[in-house]
């Protein structure tokens, strides 16, 4: 929370956070109206004055102490993620571990990334000058995070922003705000000064008001393409960083290790019930390997346990809502009606939607060209690498792609030609290391995340140039006289 939220809590109605699996209440937060945007930003403006003056070692200490706080309470964090998002316990535990790593990486960035010297004497006429540039804070950043990674994606915005000396107004998804609030509590316990991070809980009207506020210098958004377009229209002259979605292809060549490819693609397709912007959605298999891959993939999918995400044995939990599961079901039914073959799945009970595998989905079907964001994957036989690359590159989303092959030349050629922000060789599209640059080509994103790269997005360079010409001397250049100190 924040001091503003606590002082106004009595004036706002409650917003209930529900468990996607059984609908039970998990907690309540304030449903803050659009009118709260200005006081939130005013608080952040004061916090920004404090944040920019925090020594780098203190920023790093706070982030490291926060990582330790999350570590000490990791089981409670994991169970909260399960309760509010529907992720399975094993998936939630992995997310907590990644959050700890993200915070530690951010602490390292606070100490390391401070600019560099500039060789002014590299060009004639500047021999008397020396200087450097530093990375300076932007000021107030609005960070908007989604429901599918309710803890680590928050850390990916707060960590680099704090490392860079900024203040942040964080608007977590109204579906999963509790993990974010708990993380901010750890930051406060670690000594983060008041106003440096505020939490804004509410719906779209609040988000629009925050994005449109003139005092905000940057909006960092992870979410859907439609919302991203709306933000770009109303933000005005602000820096924007966005991760907007994906429809990730994976190419499987006939010479690949099929067992490894099947294991990786099953995980890549169905992790977090497919609610994953780099999740594997289309698998393009070279024809000689297609039947064997299909058989093994369906067998592995059939073995997945679907059910209560709090059960240690569960592999696939619910989607975020029954409406989301119904959307997936409708897209699959439409594809089948237009000639696709259902190989497994398409069973729904409430918000639970079974892992679903299809083949021969038409390229004109929404299931093929939209981001499905559900546990649905399509298999497609291809005659060559060229055909696979054409199909892989034809869509507007382009975060990650993957290719399986034993041929290094094929792998490197595909990596060069795939239009994606990241190409995973002998891995599914669903691999992300929190230190690497993360983003896409085309409409997949604007800017990059990954701690170092987000730090650079959230700071700005300032050049300092010193002209030292000797005591009492002066330098005369055509049309200009410069006198030394």
UniProtKB/Swiss-Prot annotation:
A Pfam family the protein falls into: Aldedh
Keywords: NAD, Oxidoreductase
Protein name: Aspartate-semialdehyde dehydrogenase 2
Keyword NAD: yes
UniProt function note: Dehydrogenase involved in the degradation of canavanine, the delta-oxa-analog of arginine, allowing growth on canavanine as sole nitrogen and carbon source. Probably catalyzes the NAD(+)-dependent oxidation of L-aspartate-semialdehyde to L-aspartate.
Chain sites annotated for binding NAD(+): 145, 171, 245, 371
GO molecular function: lactaldehyde dehydrogenase (NAD+) activity
Inducing stimuli: Up-regulated upon growth on canavanine.
Record field: catalytic activity: L-aspartate 4-semialdehyde + NAD(+) + H2O = L-aspartate + NADH + 2 H(+)
Active site, renumbered: 243, 277
Family stated for the protein in its record: Belongs to the aldehyde dehydrogenase family.
UniProt KW Nuclease keyword: no
The EC number(s) this enzyme carries: 1.2.1.-
């Amino acid at each position: 929370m924040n001091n503003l939220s606590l002082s106004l809590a009595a004036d706002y109605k409650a917003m209930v956070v529900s468990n996607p699996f059984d609908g039970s209440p998990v907690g309540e937060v304030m449903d803050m109206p659009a009118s709260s945007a200005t006081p939130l930003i005013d608080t952040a403006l004061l916090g920004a004055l404090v944040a920019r003056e925090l020594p780098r070692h203190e920023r790093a200490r706070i982030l490291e102490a926060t990582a330790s706080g999350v570590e000490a309470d990791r089981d409670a964090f994991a169970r909260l993620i399960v309760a509010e998002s529907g992720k399975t316990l094993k998936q939630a535990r992995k997310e907590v571990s990644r959050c700890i790593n993200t915070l530690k990486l951010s602490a390292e960035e606070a100490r390391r990334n401070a600019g560099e010297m500039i060789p002014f004497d590299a060009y004639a006429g500047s021999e008397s000058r020396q200087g450097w540039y530093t990375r300076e804070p932007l000021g107030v950043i609005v960070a908007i995070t989604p429901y599918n990674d309710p803890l680590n994606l928050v850390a990916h915005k707060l960590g680099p922003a704090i490392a860079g000396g900024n203040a942040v107004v964080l608007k977590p998804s109204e579906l999963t705000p509790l993990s974010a609030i708990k993380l901010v509590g750890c930051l406060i316990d670690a000594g983060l000064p008041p106003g440096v991070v505020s939490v804004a809980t509410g719906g779209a009207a609040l988000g629009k008001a925050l994005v449109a506020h003139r005092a905000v210098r940057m909006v960092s958004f992870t979410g859907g393409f439609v919302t991203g377009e709306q933000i770009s229209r109303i933000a005005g002259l602000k820096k924007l960083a966005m991760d907007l979605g994906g429809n990730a292809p994976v190419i499987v060549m006939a010479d690949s290790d099929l067992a490894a490819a099947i294991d990786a693609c099953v995980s890549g397709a169905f992790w977090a019930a497919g609610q994953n912007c780099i999740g594997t959605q289309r698998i393009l298999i070279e024809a000689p390997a297609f039947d064997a891959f299909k058989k093994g993939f369906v067998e592995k999918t059939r073995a997945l346990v679907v059910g209560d995400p709090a059960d240690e044995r569960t592999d696939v939990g619910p989607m975020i809502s029954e409406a989301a599961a119904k959307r997936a079901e409708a897209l699959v039914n439409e594809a089948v009606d237009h000639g696709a073959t259902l190989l497994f799945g398409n069973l729904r009970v409430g918000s639970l939607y079974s892992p679903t595998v299809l083949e021969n989905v038409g390229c004109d079907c929404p299931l093929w060209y939209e981001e499905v964001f559900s546990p649905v994957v399509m298999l497609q036989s291809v005659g060559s690498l060229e055909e696979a690359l054409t199909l892989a590159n034809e869509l507007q989303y382009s975060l990650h792609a993957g290719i399986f092959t034993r041929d290094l030349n094929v792998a490197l050629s595909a990596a060069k030609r795939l239009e994606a922000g990241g190409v995973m060789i002998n891995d599914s599209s669903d691999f992300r290391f929190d230190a690497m640059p993360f983003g896409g080509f085309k409409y997949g994103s604007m800017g990059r995340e990954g701690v170092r790269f987000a730090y650079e997005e959230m700071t700005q360079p300032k050049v300092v140039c010193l002209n030292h010409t000797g005591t009492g001397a002066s330098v005369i250049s055509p049309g200009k006289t410069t006198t030394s100190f």
